[in-house]
Amino acid sequence: MYQLFCFLAGIIVVYKAAQYYKRRTLVTKFHCKPARISPNKSWLEYLGIASVVHADEMIRKGGLYSEIDGRFKSLDVSTFKSITLGKTTYVTKDIENIRHILSATEMNSWNLGARPIALRPFIGDGIFASEGQSWKHSRIMLRPVFAKEHVKQITSMEPYVQLLIKIIKNHEGEPLEFQTLAHLFTIDYSTDFLLGESCDSLKDFLGEESNSTLDTSLRLAFASQFNKTQQQMTIRFMLGKLAFLMYPKSFQYSIQMQKDFVDVYIDRVVGMSEEELNNHPKSYVLLYQLARQTKNRDILQDELMSILLAGRDTTASLLTFLFFELSHHPEVFNKLKEEIERHFPDVESVTFGTIQRCDYLQWCINETMRLHPSVPFNFRTAANDTVIPRGGGKSCTDPILVHKGEQVLFSFYSVNREEKYFGTNTDKFAPERWSESLRRTEFIPFSAGPRACLGQQLPRVEASYVTIRLLQTFHGLHNASKQYPPNRVVAATMRLTDGCNVCFI
């Protein structure tokens, strides 16, 4: 027994010595220096359970991203170190660090950490929860779906825009909660684009008869359970590796209802021949394109749930905050309306190409995504001992050694408020800041590197089309809430806590 103990102790000593030597070699080679440490403000933070105890409050008040931004300012750094129960997390808004971590050359040095644990009940091994060969396979399958020729199918949005306009006209001149309508529009168009048939939530809002072939109770349950799932998924993200603690029956029910909804459409395509798939009138639909590559039900379900999760809320968030800002900046609204009237005299003139050429519209969209990023932060976990290029030493410009298992969280919310990147008054909504010909490489609303969003053109095109059509139809927009800047909340994406209360006239 004594000999076994000595043998095991010897192995540990050798391992620790080798680990120490390797780390010292990295420190010497890259001239690494320690980062500034952010002190814990309470014993809950030190124990690492503040995010658990205050999870609901942080979600409702958007506390996490504003708390991070406040620490950057109080420490006067772009990268700081946080220690909780001996576990280290580096938090950065330095774009050089972010681009380094997300680059292709660093893919083997970083992994998704606890993200797969948080997402797996909902999207299984879909593209947002997979790594390595599984992720590469997902990306190869999905890339053709988001090719420009499919994104250009903008006329397929018009029926849902017509329903949106009808709802607004029913409340013309009255306060209207636009955030809800933005989510109804995007869930309708997303299900049409992904599955080939809309869930008709806008028609339900209007009290009109649905054209869906689905059972009414299943269709209604799908739309209502979607928001509940996202709220609970946010808490799972905050719990990290303890996400398994957040798995109540209500969460399981919400997920199952959404999978049952998607499975109806999967059942249909699994039974279709290759000829039927190729000749289908909606050949651009994601499900049909995936079914040409595989009939594996699990793969189809995981990828559909992944894209549905990402596609629906990103566009809804962008539309919500764009119209919120336009309602509080009448001079921007008036200028944008003039530009739209000049570029788009009628519905037929709205094409993928003309949308791209309307500069002021694109400036407004960029400024909205800068000020209100739909995903305000992201993170990676070191797969082995590695180095990030900046943030260490007294000058905060030296490299930092990151040990295996340590996490780096990067705040796009804070990056987008850096004056050295985006000019003065970065808390102000100012589309004209995008008029400079210099390309802002620091602006990465859809991430960067190999894992950059495949469908990043889609929310831009959707938001552009809806904005054009609404400004073609209505001549004025007023805010029905004086709260500015707004209270924001992070669910799957950033949202307005009190909704987007506006008046169209």
From Swiss-Prot:
SUPFAM superfamilies: Cytochrome P450 (SSF48264)
InterPro entries attached to this UniProt entry: Cyt_P450 (IPR001128), Cyt_P450_CS (IPR017972), Cyt_P450_E_CYP52_ascomycetes (IPR002974), Cyt_P450_E_CYP52_fungi (IPR047146), Cyt_P450_E_grp-II (IPR002402), Cyt_P450_sf (IPR036396)
Bilayer topology term: Single-pass membrane protein
Gene3D superfamilies tied to this protein: Cytochrome P450
Stimuli inducing this protein: By various alkanes.
Keyword terms: Heme, Iron, Membrane, Metal-binding, Monooxygenase, Oxidoreductase, Transmembrane, Transmembrane helix
PANTHER family linked to this entry: P450, PUTATIVE (EUROFUNG)-RELATED
Protein name: Cytochrome P450 52C1
Gene name of the encoded protein: CYP52C1
